[in-house]
Each structure stands twice: as C-alpha cells, then as structure tokens.
From Swiss-Prot:
Gene3D superfamilies: Type IV secretion system, VirB5-domain. The gene is virB5. Transcription is turned on at the beginning of the stationary phase of vegetative growth. The virB operon is essential for intracellular survival and is not involved in the invasion process. Constitutes a major determinant of virulence in mice. It comes from Brucella abortus (strain 2308). The lineage of its organism: Bacteria, Pseudomonadati, Pseudomonadota, Alphaproteobacteria, Hyphomicrobiales. The keyword Repeat does not apply. Residues 219-238 are annotated as: Disordered. This is Type IV secretion system protein virB5. Pfam families: T4SS (PF07996). InterPro entries: T4SS_VirB5, T4SS_VirB5-domain. Belongs to the virb5 family.
Length: 238
C-alpha cells in the first residue's frame, strides 16, 4: 500500500511539472503589441509625409532661385543693337569723294526732300563740284545719324520702363533677377552707343575741317590756274 501511494504521488508530481512547461497564450498582450506596432507605423508614415513636404518646399525654393525664366530677351528690339552703322567712316569718305552719288538710303531721301536749291549745279569743274556736293551732303548725313541715335536711345529707355513694370508684376526672385540683368544690359548698351556717338561727332567735326581744307586747296588751285596771287601761307606750303 505504501508503494502504491508513493507511485501515485510521483505521478502527480510529474504531471504538475509537465503542465508547468506548456506555453501560456496571452491574447490581451498580443493585441496591445499589435496596436503599438500599428501606432509606430502610422507615426513613420507621418514622418515620411513631412519629409516629403519639406523636400518639395525646398525644391520650390531652389527652383525659385535657379533656372532660366527666359526673360533675357523679353521686350528686346534687335534693331537697336547698333543704330549707328559700323562703316560710318567709310560713308564719310565716300561722300567726300563722290558727292551726291555717295548719298544713299535715308540720307539721299532727306536730301531730296530738304533741298530747295542746288548750289553746286552750276560748277563746271568736277573736283570743285564734288567738294561742294560733299559739303551739302555732310550736314544731312549728320542729321540722319543723330536722329537714329536719338530714336534708338528713346526706345531703349521705353524698354527699361517696361522691364521695370514687369518687375512689379512678378514675385519670382529669379525672374526679378533676370529682369534686373536686362535693365543693366540696356543701360550698358546706351552707354556704349553714347560713346560711339561721341566718337562719331568727333569724326564729323574732323570731317568738316577736312572739307574746309579741301575747299581752300581747290580754291587755291583754281586761283593758280587763273594766275591769281596765292596767300602767303599757301605759297609757303607749296
């Protein structure tokens, strides 16, 4: 009997130990862990969305300061790049040697419209006639050049005013920078053309002196041919 009791007690002990080793499933803990995991996933998604928005905002700011808005040529008039001809010195020399025949374009048109009497028509000597014609054409040519310079400068100033109005219409920093660059470019072109115009005026004054000197020489030549006494200054020169 004692052996039976001991055997039964041993069996109970083994059974209790076996039950103690089985895992216990806690449904509440699993649900809480899942909820925590989902909450973390939502936070991660929100952080990713915030980072995406920050990136887009930085990209917009970068694009606002960089890139090309295509405003470098807005309101630009290509005819104003050089309203004074590059060969104006050649034009002067052509008039000096060709007279009326060298007058072309606007100069010839203005000469025909403004001339009421030709003071050179009655001159029979060819050199004297061409010299006379050159003196007639020269101021007309100067007026055409000066008028072109004035009109072009006025148009450039109108362009600058329009560009300033465009600046007031936009809030794009890069567009404003491009428009300001255009304004600076137009101002530089006005200064460059002003320098060219000053050189042109100096050349015109020198050309007037050459025409006067040429006329004096032709008069002296004609006087010598006629046997008239020449001025002492000319006698010393020859």
């Amino acid at each position: 009997m004692k052996k039976i009791i001991l055997s039964f007690a041993f069996a109970l002990t083994v059974t209790s130990t076996a039950h103690a080793q089985l895992p216990v499933t806690d449904a509440g803990s699993i649900a809480q862990n899942l909820a925590n995991h989902l909450e973390q996933m939502v936070k991660f998604a929100q952080q990713i969305e915030q980072l995406k928005q920050q990136f887009e905002q930085q990209k917009m700011q970068f694009d606002a300061l960089t890139g090309n808005r295509g405003l470098g040529d807005i309101l630009r008039d290509p005819t104003l790049r050089s309203y004074l001809p590059h060969n104006w010195r050649d034009l002067y020399e052509a008039v000096m040697s060709g007279g009326y025949l060298a007058a072309a374009g606007e100069t010839a048109n203005l000469l025909r419209k403004s001339q009421v009497y030709d003071p050179c028509a009655s001159i029979s000597d060819k050199d004297q006639r061409i010299a006379c014609e050159a003196k007639v054409v020269k101021p007309v040519q100067d007026k055409v050049m000066t008028s072109k310079a004035y009109d072009a400068t006025d148009k450039r100033l109108q362009e600058i005013e329009s560009l300033m109005q465009e600046i007031n219409k936009t809030g794009d920093p890069k567009a404003i920078a491009e428009l300001q660059g255009r304004i600076e470019s137009e101002n530089a072109m006005i200064q460059n053309e002003d320098t060219r115009l000053r050189l042109y005026q100096q050349m015109a004054e020198a050309q007037d002196k050459l025409l006067d000197e040429r006329q004096h020489e032709l008069d002296a030549k004609d006087n010598a041919r006629r046997g008239y006494p020449q001025p002492k200054a000319l006698e010393a020169a020859y």
